[in-house]
């Protein structure tokens, strides 16, 4: 029927609006919606929530040296490797460029550091075809009582920046609020 066809088109459009075309990961829009929902949930019911953010090291040089097709290949490779190592509850999103974030519901700082470390090791253990070893810098932040999504995102982003500043290719815990 027409209604069934319309429903399918609607579902396809929704999927397109929340996923990254290149990697198939969820996009920034979906991440923002989901983060707000998860924060509302932990504020209501308690529990834990953490973010693991990563930024591919020297990505511009990959693009400059090997071309944009190779850059796209690196992004796709990273998504596949990350997806294979995530737990079922984790949500992988591409924020844009070479930046990814994993939303980890029901996860505290210690658990999130373990998730990030496993992802970091998985990425650095296998070279990308035609490019070689590509690493990433990771930041980890757990939600703190009363914290906004923007604040949590800022802290995890600052942790990635600290990892880059400390020499890249590492996992860095965020500084607690206050």
What are these regions (language model features)?
Residues 1-11:
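PAS-associated C-terminal cap
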Residues 91-94:
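A short pre-motif secondary-structure segment
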Residues 79-83, 111-127, 157:
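Alpha-helical scaffold within the catalytic cores of cyclic-nucleotide enzymes
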Residues 14-33, 54-68, 76:
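Conserved nucleotide-binding and Mg2+-coordinating catalytic segments in signaling enzymes
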Residues 14-15, 28-48, 79-87, 105:
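Short regulatory alpha-helical coupling segments
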Residues 113-116, 142-178:
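Catalytic-core segments of nucleotide cyclases and related cyclic-nucleotide turnover enzymes
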């Amino acid at each position: 029927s027409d209604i069934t066809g319309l429903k399918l088109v609607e579902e396809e459009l929704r999927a397109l609006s929340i996923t990254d075309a290149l990697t198939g990961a969820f996009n920034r829009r979906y991440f923002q919606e989901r983060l707000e929902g998860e924060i509302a949930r932990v504020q209501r019911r308690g529990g834990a929530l953490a973010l693991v953010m990563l930024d591919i090291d020297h990505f511009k040089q990959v693009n400059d040296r090997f071309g944009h097709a190779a850059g796209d290949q690196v992004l796709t490779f990273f998504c596949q490797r990350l997806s294979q190592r995530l737990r079922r509850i984790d949500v992988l999103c591409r924020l844009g460029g070479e930046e990814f974030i994993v939303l980890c519901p029901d996860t505290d700082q210690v658990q999130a550091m373990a998730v990030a470390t496993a992802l970091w090791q998985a990425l650095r253990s296998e070279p990308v075809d035609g490019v070689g070893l590509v690493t990433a810098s990771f930041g980890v932040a757990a939600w703190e009582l009363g914290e906004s999504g923007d604040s949590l995102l800022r802290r995890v982003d600052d942790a990635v920046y600290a990892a880059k500043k400390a020499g890249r290719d590492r996992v860095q815990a965020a500084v607690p609020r206050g």
